[in-house]
Amino acid sequence: MNIGIMSMQRIINYGSFLQAYGLKKTIQNMGHTVTFVDYRVGKPLVSESISSNQKFESKFKRMMKVFFSPPYRMNRKQSIDSSKAFSNFCHTFQNEWLPILGVTDERVYSPKLDVLVIGSDEVFNCTQSNLDVGYSPQLFGYENSAEKLITYAASFGSTTIEKLDKYGKTTEISNLLKEFDAISVRDKNSHDIIKTLTAIYPIDSIDPVLLYCLLYTSPSPRDS
């Protein structure tokens, strides 16, 4: 079958890469073709808060700190060094890691599929301020072109029923979730939210990184 995975495959961190890789390899080892599917990044429901001190600190005041405060200069240097290190990591991720997943610069939206798997990772964590994710109905199956729609080890992360109510998304997400053919989650919070919004008891699954290790890696001699 032609199976798509919609996950956090473009988010630049180790965990997102490993879970995407683990799920892709597990499905491929079952004899299927796998394509990563992109979601459209929307505006976050939550605005990232900036402290008033940081927001209104004048340029002149920051310059005075640089000139007269050794601790500030040290912290500033560490911040610049960290920024350079992260920039190098992003370059490596884009040019070496994403090709391992088969992910290119070209975005893939709503392809024709036999099955679309949404997950794993915090694909349902919609009340966060991350601009790389935002609020995206596609992560809840909206506008998909697959014959079957399922999740694997999906998570709401820090999102709760109370937060969905606060931002007026409870009904919309409930209706979208009811269109899934099967739902599995990886944590109790996500299990409870699915049960509350859909009256469906989702399957509790392990993270695909752990699944891949259990299925396809041999124990070391010390574990024998």
Give each language-model segment a name.
Residues M1-I3:
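Extreme N-terminal starter segment of soluble prokaryotic enzymes
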Residues I5-Y14, L18-N175:
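Aromatic- and Gly/Pro-rich donor/ligand-binding loops
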Residues Y21, D187-K188:
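Alpha-helix N-cap/helix-start capping motif
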Residues V123, N189-S190:
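Alpha-helix capping/helix-boundary segments
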Residues I161-E162, Y212-L215:
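Short, charged, surface-exposed secondary-structure boundary motifs
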Residues F180-R186:
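A short beta-strand/loop micro-motif in the catalytic core of glycosyltransferases
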Residues H191-V209:
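Helix-loop-beta element that forms the nucleotide-linked donor phosphate-binding surface
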Residues Y216-S224:
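Single conserved hydrophobic/aromatic residue that forms the stacking wall/gate
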